[in-house]
Curated annotation (Swiss-Prot):
GO biological process, one term: DNA replication, synthesis of primer
Matches recorded under CDD domains: AE_Prim_S
The entry's keywords: DNA replication, DNA-directed RNA polymerase, Magnesium, Manganese, Metal-binding, Nucleotidyltransferase, Primosome, Transcription, Transferase, Zinc
Cofactor requirement: Mg(2+); Mn(2+)
Molecular function in Gene Ontology: DNA-directed RNA polymerase activity; metal ion binding
Organism listed in the record: Saccharolobus islandicus (strain M.16.4 / Kamchatka #3) (Sulfolobus islandicus)
Tagged with keyword Magnesium: yes
Full protein name: DNA primase small subunit PriS
Amino acid sequence: MGTFTLHQGQSNLIKSFFRNYYLNAELGLPNDMELREFALQPFGSDTYIRHLSFSSSEELRDYLVNRNLPLHLFYSSARYQLPGARDMEEKAWMGSDLLFDIDADHICKLRSIRFCPVCGNAITSEKCERDNVETLEYVEMTSECIKRGLEEARNLVEILEDDFGLKPKVYFSGNRGFHVQVDCYGDCALLDSDERKEIAEYVMGVGVPSYPGGGENAPGWVGRKNRGINGVTIDGQVTIDVKRLIRIPNSLHGKSGLIVKEVTNLDDFEFNEALSPFTGYTIFLPYISIETEVLSRNIKLNRGVPIKIESSIGIYLHLKNLGEVKAYVR
């Protein structure tokens, strides 16, 4: 049984789903895309292709569909004079957007299981000695955890708008959290890493004192502290990095098959199948027996027993390592 291999990018069926999506996808590209570095992780590879440059959406689409189909797709938060240069100094940095990353799994304690895809047994090590294969890990993302991440995004937006006068945009990351982005020009774009660190620490509540009185409706941190908000849980390194890569809006996340989607109304966001572009049904073959929450639905899988299920769910389960999509059923 040692011949078993698995890679998220090995399935030709999954590749066909992604390729068909990118044939017509309207990617959310910046209006200065010719100044941005593009990067991607292609199917069948663990490494990124970087230092790409495109001048139009048509040129980018042709590259993605006909040359390197992406499992993950990015552009740089930075603008460069020569974005395609391989040397970072040669690129000549011109400024960057301001980014914040909220990972729901940093907020919640999530259920995870490591298992052998051949025998289906739960195994704590990275290899199943009996079947001589690498084990896989599944982490259950719940709707409740996503809701908590959304609340963090809501608090962050309030701080950026009220305390800094900025106009942030919120994006569902396509997997387990939210990205908050401020399109920066002028002085904002030229903030260095130290200045961005100060902003990150401010929104995290680092060094912000408690203020007596004022009530919950008081402005700024006075009101927030009285509402029990002591800071926003973000990945500070993302904000500090002036050359960070951003997932392209309306691209697909290769660990879920869900769309990286702008959330224009935080009250309307739901973690469900509508985040997937895939329609129809698939035949899914589970590696293990498990009951789990998937896109706000409870799903029961039995090891080795094929199940007909919506493509949105089947592709999600496949990319989460729980089994394989074996066929597409219209």
